[in-house]
Amino acid sequence: MSDSFYRYDVIVIGGGHAGTEAALAAARAGARTLLLTHNIETVGAMSCNPAIGGIGKGHLVKEIDALGGAMAKAADLAGIQWRTLNASKGPAVRATRCQADRNLYRSAIRRIVEAQPNLTVFQAAVDDLIIHNGAAEGDSVRGVITQTGLRFEATAVVLTAGTFLAGKIHVGETQYAAGRMGDPPATTLAARLRERPFAIDRLKTGTPPRIDGRTLDYTMMDEQPGDDPLPVMSFMGQVSDHPTQVSCWITHTTEQTHDIIRGALHRSPLYSGQIEGIGPRYCPSIEDKVVRFADKTSHQIFVEPEGLDVTEIYPNGISTSLPFDVQLALVRSIRGFAQAHITRPGYAIEYDFFDPRGLKASLETKAVGGLFFAGQINGTTGYEEAAAQGLLAGLNAARHVQALPAWSPRRDEAYLGVLVDDLITHGTTEPYRMFTSRAEYRLQLREDNADLRLTGVGRAMGLVDDARWARFSSKQEAVQRETARLSALWATPGNALGREVVDTLGVPMSRETNVLDLIKRPELSYAALMRVPTLGPGVDDAQVAEQVEIGVKYAGYLDRQRDEIARQQRHETTPIPEGFDYAGVRGLSMEVQQKLERVRPQSIGQAQRIPGMTPAAISLLLVHLERARRSQVA
């Protein structure tokens, strides 16, 4: 092998959702990138539920897509049931979700990875990092060492190890080391990382038993068909990309199910003290649900097919680590599951994660230069949260190599910005999941405008290809043309257009009205307006029509939110230098000093969001920073 085989700009460790997006982003941004995975066959694998998107999560997928990422494209190629959640509510909380064929999804991701220029994939487990100990500039990463002793060099490394760092599986009283069922853990790497100055703790997650769908009685369940017409996930996607569509089903646990679980809690690793890690609040195990909601006589279960060519079913809602004999009994007590055959047991898995307050907004670690963390190791849960972090870390790893400034979106620019800011400012003690409720500016952060918010900046950083840019530019121009066309037209009670509007739509008109303003009426939409002969048929592109309507109907709310953002931004981006001496700021209490020292915020905005931070403390910081700036100028 030539020396170039061992030397890269960026190395990504791990081929899951964070790792693949990180490697693809680094390569698109111009870095010669190596993706190391313990098994090439599992690149892009969906380890838990076979679904992409949902409330908050779908927003992240759209943002990944707007920045040129792969997740939405793969979802379009693998989605076997599609739904728009909150379809009857406002655009800020509408979310796209697809049930995915896990084999089609994995294949789609692998094809995208293998077709990406600048990106090499190599199968190897990583046991250690090569760290340069610089006396003056601090520690920095220089590469990795594999299990077989190969040394790969790079000036930026992205670690996306998922649940593999010291992973331990629990099924009842049985426990053993694993990264997920069937895969070995990264035990040596975990031990090496514990020797470094990182704050490390344990989290846990779980997965339900898988069921042979041929052994279920669907007549006892409620069918849940997908939407018609079908949505798409990617801005570049088409309905024709989707494979064959199928239904999901809904059933429920019974009182017998709950009795079985209560009678076996003493054998649950969750309640025996065997598991130390904290699990995800919003995806609790069935044991947790039965204990925490003791008054409920049943819990809903979504019966989700794992793919078109397999018989396995994913019973969403019964994640468990109970012993297998208990799993079998509880499964067969569920409506329609009396004859169920379990193909794989459910289990819980504990793993190492790093306190994300040890990260910069770029996801570079504060302790080791050039080392980036992304995904579950930062305390998050979910494919979408991992993929979004991976894209950001991969991009910034490439920019680190190229000596370019790091980039991270603000809270008012992207859910990705909310995610990262929450993590690096507040940290987390339980797996973090994205919800629309976490964003204070969610009317600005809609699925439908992810491209408008992020594609321009993505293009400037090399993430967006020519085809996407051309289509995005065309959409923008079409929105502007249609908005201008309608705003130039006026309807009055006496003119022909006004009479057409009244006759066609049955709406009253007492004074001269701009046609565009008609969309602001609650009972009217762009589609309704286009039924007026003089105005129709309108634009063919549904995305363009949607942007025109939302831009008009919510103009007042959007303007007020933009004003609020402008006020908040006054000091948001004021930087705080690395190594800033908080003890030198006169008037800061010891409590505030300790909080600032622990988080080490990179900006005044981040400092403001530290729990317990006072307006007085922020004022003192601003005064001190301004004095320092003036003394440097002088």
From Swiss-Prot:
Main location (coarse class): cytoplasm
Binding site for NAD(+): 279-293
Cofactor: FAD
GO molecular function term, any single one: flavin adenine dinucleotide binding
KW Cytoplasm (keyword) present: yes
Subcellular location: Cytoplasm
Family the UniProt entry places it in: Belongs to the MnmG family.
Alphabetical list of NCBIfam families matching this protein: mnmG_gidA (TIGR00136)
Name of this protein: tRNA uridine 5-carboxymethylaminomethyl modification enzyme MnmG
Organism: Xanthomonas campestris pv. campestris (strain B100)
Classification of source organism: Bacteria, Pseudomonadati, Pseudomonadota, Gammaproteobacteria, Lysobacterales
